[in-house]
Amino acid sequence: MLFRKKIFSVYVLLYVFMSLTSACVEKSVDPTDPAAAFARAREPYDDEMYEIAIQRLGEFKSRYPYSKHAPEAEILIANSQYAMSRYAEAASSYEQFVKLHPRHEQAAFAQFRVGESYWAEAPDDIDREQDYTLKAIAEWEKLVTSYPQSEESKKAKNLLDKGRRRVAEHSEFIAKFYCKQEIYHACAYRYLQLTEQYPQFSDLVKKAYTQAAKAFAQLADGKSKDEQSESNIYYKSLSSQQLRDKAEEFRGKAAAIQL
């Protein structure tokens, strides 16, 4: 890692040296020409020197805030942050771009990248909190609603299914945890919540109904360990017979799902 950092530093210094040398030889950029200034500012971006690109493009934005190239400079800054895995900064930059330029030709791309930035931060493991996955889903849903005809919207729809599946599996993981701890009120509640929020995943819904039925059967027999916790007593008003009826109801729902 240290070796790579040294190599990167050498490349940065070399790039700066070459830029300065070039500046001495070439004709200076006309300060009244935003197009020429932008072309010069984006050179580091084209050469994948993203840290320098952020600086140069930021200076261009400050100098020519009303230029037609200013929005493109904003996108390139966000792209640079994303390329450097600075996802929180990238998400903020892309979000700001959409807010300022909702009708720009790059707006759909920027909205897609807001979601992608959060997605890059989200853990793959379903036993970990999925806050970033939920944020990505929310941003892609905005994209599909605001820019339904865009190519990015089509990509987002595929990723939305993947994201929702991950969150559903995380919900299943939590429900399983409660069942293993014999906390059956919370177990049944979590499984039924999964069936309501993610009905499109038939395999998960079938398992959820099956496990909810088992949890209700345990509750009917008074075997839950969460009876002393008011926050977890979701079905305390139900009699033993009503709990058994619930168990039978959800066994039937599970059996009705054909995979």
What name fits each language-model region?
Residues M1-V12:
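Bacterial N-terminal signal peptides that target proteins for export
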Residues L2-F3, T21-L259:
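Acidic, polar-rich low-complexity tracts and alpha-helical solenoid repeat scaffolds
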Residues Y11-S19:
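Bacterial N-terminal signal peptides
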